[in-house]
């Protein structure tokens, strides 16, 4: 069983005891690694958040597991960050990424018409601060490509009457890159980086 499959099986078990009508996070590693529940606990918050993101997922994979990662929980609000792994793959064209994303949104709307959907802007990267083994990936997943993708994600949100949220300002240096001190290897974000955006994110959890 792969790491992805093991996580999915664990989520299926955890869903049996989960409280419905709460908040769900889903997507790939940048959402999986966001320690939202740790930060909420530090503030004494009673907001219930279920993180159902799985590292390594592309849009096509999330489409196949919406039952486990969204539907079974019947959330009142779902936050999605999916597509960055697609952006890192030169074989996957942008229009296909957005077609898959569109299908994900439509599926949620059909199954859970009362659920509010929040599409999160993709985070910036930092090629200069990247580990050597990440530089090839970041030649494909550039900040220019991320900016273009974010404009399309925003259009998707508008098309569906859903929400697009960009909380990236706190992550960026003067050149619009992910701040070097906030990244693990040029691409993923460390806890300090997530703290820098949590206050902005919290507004959407609370409102």
Language model features with spans:
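Conserved catalytic region of serine esterases and O-acyltransferases that act on ester linkages
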Residues: 1-9, 17-20, 192-207
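Conserved SGNH/GDSL esterase-like catalytic core that processes O-acyl groups on lipids
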Residues: 2-103
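General small-molecule cofactor/ligand-binding pocket signal
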Residues: 50, 118, 163-165
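Alpha/beta-hydrolase-fold catalytic nucleophile elbow
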Residues: 81, 120-121
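Generic structural signal for well-ordered alpha-helices
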Residues: 101-106, 150
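A short helix->loop->beta-strand "cap" motif at the edges of active sites that frequently abuts
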Residues: 112-116
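Catalytic His-Asp segment of secreted/periplasmic serine-dependent ester chemistry enzymes
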Residues: 124-207
């Amino acid at each position: 069983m792969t790491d992805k499959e093991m996580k999915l099986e664990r989520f299926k078990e955890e869903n049996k005891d989960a409280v419905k009508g709460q908040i769900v996070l889903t997507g790939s590693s940048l959402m999986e690694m966001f320690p939202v529940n740790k930060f909420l606990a530090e503030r004494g918050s009673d907001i219930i958040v279920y993180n159902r993101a799985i590292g390594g997922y592309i849009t096509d994979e999330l489409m196949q597991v919406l039952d486990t990662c969204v539907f079974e929980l019947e959330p009142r609000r779902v936050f999605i960050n999916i597509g960055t792994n697609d952006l890192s793959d030169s074989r996957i064209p942008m229009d296909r990424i957005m077609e898959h994303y569109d299908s994900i949104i439509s599926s949620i709307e059909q199954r859970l018409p009362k659920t509010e959907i929040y599409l999160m802007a993709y985070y910036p990267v930092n090629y200069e601060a990247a580990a050597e083994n990440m530089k090839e990936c970041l030649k494909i997943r550039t900040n220019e490509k991320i900016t273009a993708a974010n404009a399309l994600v925003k259009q998707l949100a508008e098309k569906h009457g859903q929400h697009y949220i960009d909380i990236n300002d706190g992550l960026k240096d003067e050149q619009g890159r992910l701040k070097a001190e906030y990244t693990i290897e040029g691409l993923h974000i460390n806890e300090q980086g997530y703290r820098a955006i949590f206050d902005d994110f919290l507004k959407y959890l609370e409102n």
